[in-house]
């Protein structure tokens, strides 16, 4: 195994968390609530309406191939624009739809104020700014989630959102992470960006083709133009000895096979990147898919500069994944 890569044998001990002394919400709360019915139909936000949300620092207008979307974000702890912010943690959520365009979950009952409160708690806990990045069609963002998720367009939009926020707030480096499809996006951006200090892939599919093959999803396999595979970009990941990558998963998972996550980690290790595979049998039944609390914790600790051994021990000492709405 190359230097900087490790399969984790976790030994637990309790760790106190660093606290921010003055992490204030950057985004402005409102009474807006998220609607699952709107997600099923597709969310449209006009450019002018998006400008009003931009003034509240909960949105950015992003264009790819001449078509724009109003993508939402919920932030706390940032120095006001134009910054500077030496580092900021950003989390990309997992899917909020299942196998049907009418099966929507996770965001129901939440709204802008709740998301800002969530990020404020994380910013205060870890002492660095925290942002929740809403993918197209979800958590208030415009777009049609059913047809955009997992696509090259989604990846391009989310990468462009990071660029807009980087410029707006003077972010020098990102600690970037995500759950499930958000973790897949995180892996994809390893090859697209030179400003990642941390990458946390939590219950993700960073070897997307291998995931489709393992699950026997032949319809998707027959349309490779409809998805992206971060494993195809492994040789384009820039070398950065300061960057740390954590691949977190539950070996019992039935949705994204852990072997596919292990294979991606091993490919990172073979190329000499500083990466750690973190197997945690802590996700809830029946699918063993959610480790969001663990991913957020790894992201906050890595972004705040905590040494790797303490990060791994903290994850080991945490209780099992709790029920939660946001992902």
Language model region names:
Residues 185-227:
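Hydrolase active-site cap/lid region
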